[in-house]
Amino acid sequence: MRRKLAAGNWKMNGTGAALDALEAIAGAHSAAAVDLLICPPATLLYRAAQVAEGSRVRIGGQDCHAVTAGAHTGDISAMMLADAGASAVILGHSERRADHGETDAQVCDKARAALEAGLIAIICIGETLAQREAGQTLDVVCAQLAGSVPDGIDGTRVVVAYEPVWAIGTGLVPTLEQIAEVHDTLRQQLIGRFGSETAEAIRLLYGGSVKPGNAAEIFAVSNVDGALVGGASLTAADFSPIVSALEQAAG
């Protein structure tokens, strides 16, 4: 049985004062029946890990380099994230793909490095609005899945997050039927590539304007194992109801 996961991506938000929100989230879910992850900016990662120590909340990074060390100014390796207290890392987010031109092959290399460093790799995929309107959604996400997920994986260490680019931060959300179609297709693609045992261990998250008001209905969709939450993860007031909805879905 896959354990549900509520992951918060703080993106480029938060200074030291934001750790109060992390403390509040941890305090509100001291006996959480689902996995909790907060991915703060790199500048807060070590301090966030200290705040979260002893709680049910784990801390993750928002990106990593594909190599361990070297002349890569401004980059952070997976080993560095782990050393700072991270247990997971988000990879291939659409904002990274758009702002930094990251390719599926680069995301795959980063995922391999993350897994080798002992981190859980959260690999993001998703179509643009133009691709959705052109009827290309399944082709796009299946190609991203094939190109971004490494071979030879332990399914318990890999998470795939479906985030339609057009739904991120816009308030727009796909229909429940559209979410189900993508998640069911991704599961079948994973089974075809890795076999049932590995594929059924991989958690599939939905991301894109997840809020307290729509979380419960999204979590009721088949093959949705949780959420990768953006802006709504910045405060306990918004994130806690999402976590509670996921706990209800987990039974």
UniProtKB/Swiss-Prot annotation:
Pathway: Carbohydrate biosynthesis; gluconeogenesis; Carbohydrate degradation; glycolysis; D-glyceraldehyde 3-phosphate from glycerone phosphate: step 1/1. It holds the Pfam family TIM. Its main location: cytoplasm. The keyword Oxidoreductase does not apply. It catalyses: D-glyceraldehyde 3-phosphate = dihydroxyacetone phosphate. Its EC number is 5.3.1.1. One of its GO terms (molecular function) is triose-phosphate isomerase activity. GO terms for cellular component: cytosol. GO terms for biological process: gluconeogenesis; glyceraldehyde-3-phosphate biosynthetic process; glycerol catabolic process; glycolytic process. It is found in: Cytoplasm. Keywords: Cytoplasm, Gluconeogenesis, Glycolysis, Isomerase. InterPro entries: Aldolase_TIM, TIM_sf, TrioseP_Isoase_bac/euk, Triosephosphate_isomerase, Triosephosphate_isomerase_AS. Substrate binds at N9, W10, K11, G169, S209, G230, G231. Gene3D superfamilies: Aldolase class I (3.20.20.70). The active site is at H93, E163. Involved in the gluconeogenesis. Catalyzes stereospecifically the conversion of dihydroxyacetone phosphate (DHAP) to D-glyceraldehyde-3-phosphate (G3P). Homodimer. PANTHER family: TRIOSEPHOSPHATE ISOMERASE. Belongs to the triosephosphate isomerase family. This is Triosephosphate isomerase. It comes from Ruegeria pomeroyi (strain ATCC 700808 / DSM 15171 / DSS-3) (Silicibacter pomeroyi). The gene is tpiA.
